[in-house]
Amino acid sequence: MHIAIVTAGGAGMFCGSCIHDNTWARALRDAGVEVSLIPLYTPIRVDEADQTSSPVFFGGINTFLEDRFSWWGRVPRFLTRWLDSPSIIRMVTQRAISTDARELGAMTVSMIEGEHGPHRRAGEELAQYITHLKPDIVCFSNALLCGTLRTLKQTYFGPVHCVLQGDDIFLDGLVEPYRSRAMAMLSQRAADFDGFMTHSHYYRDYMAAYLKLPVEKFRQLPLALDCAPHDGQPRDVCGDPPTIGYFARICPEKGLDRLVKAVLLVRERIPNVRLRAGGYLAAQHRSYLDDVTHAAAPLGDAFEYIGSPAEKQEKIEFLKSLDVFSVPTVYREPKGIYVLEAWSNGIPVVLPSHGAFPQLIESTGGGLLVAPESPEDLADALEKVLTDEVLRKNLAQLGHEGIRSKHNLQNLARATLALFDSTGTGPGTIMS
């Protein structure tokens, strides 16, 4: 069986969707499946072995120029191809390419326009490449890539599925009139996919309604993590000082400001508690971090932001320094890979009771759920975990064991193959 996975690069940042797509490709390869992981826009940035092996399609620089200058798409390809070089794109993404939805409305619309828009040539190149690969199944990593679908289906006759991993968050961040235009086109074009996958029941139901599609077209793909590098173990006793941790993108929707409010309440009861935070910080969110740092001023040296570690081992060492982990998101999280990372190192979690979190907690029992938007409830739960040694160790042990038994790479590969078999798109059932 040969599966082609088309994944969108994260413009130089560690992106949860990219990381899970990369993990997915590795899990399938380990199970004996042939996999082609195809990057779009930019090279992916991951903290494990990169599973991509193809050129970058829809290179971010050329895509930007095609969107800005109508004549750029008529420039001979041999004159523009060098701009799709991964090294060139990496150099530019360090300083120029934005992933802020507020700035990408026009480009989002033009990408969804597909064969009718300025990126028609790029779509044809991707379609030709995939058709030449002759995979049994194609999987796109988000619905915003649907502009290529009709061009692809002119030459490739196998099934094309889509993994939804937070598409609504980006779309809802678009400014008008681009959001309305993008949504209208997306609802129509998304229907061309043969099936959809989500990582939670919540997101399945939400996106079926959001895209106006029958829920019967949706299947669940479990989240998974390679636990081998994660050597943290559940602690017998709480650290001194007790440490609350956060590791996710630094942005308003992830809720670090909410965690600071809760920790300030915890500090009234546990005077030596500290808060350690880490994660990618985009330029547009530096002022947000400034506000968070100002709000955390009463904590003094007990608040620390470590930045975004360049190496996985640095992140693991950070996680191992924690006693409890929390990312109190404002939005409803569709995945939650950072939860798996905490569990893999023996850290219990406290999370808002919305999005994918209840299903994740149910799968292992490795944490507590609290009322969303309540710093008081969050503070009470954090204090409970830090002061009840039996509870803390029990939650840590359940999460540590649960991720290894239920969210491992072998289960991800088995679930993928079973999913395609159940939809009639297993090996040997299609021709391309």
Language-model segments: residues:
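A short, well-ordered alpha-helix in the C-terminal region of glycosyltransferases
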Residues: 377, 384, 391-405, 412-418
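A conserved catalytic-core segment of Leloir-type glycosyltransferases
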Residues: 37-125
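Conserved donor-binding/catalytic core segment of Leloir-type glycosyltransferases
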Residues: 236-254, 260-263, 276
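Conserved acidic donor-binding segment of nucleotide-sugar-dependent glycosyltransferases
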Residues: 363, 368-375, 384-390
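Glycosyltransferase donor-sugar binding loop
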Residues: 274-290, 305-308
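Nucleotide-activated donor-binding/catalytic signature segment of Leloir-type glycosyltransferases, i.e.
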Residues: 289-313
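Carbohydrate-associated surface elements
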Residues: 202, 224
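Short hydrophobic beta-strand element within catalytic cores of glycosyltransferases
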Residues: 348-351
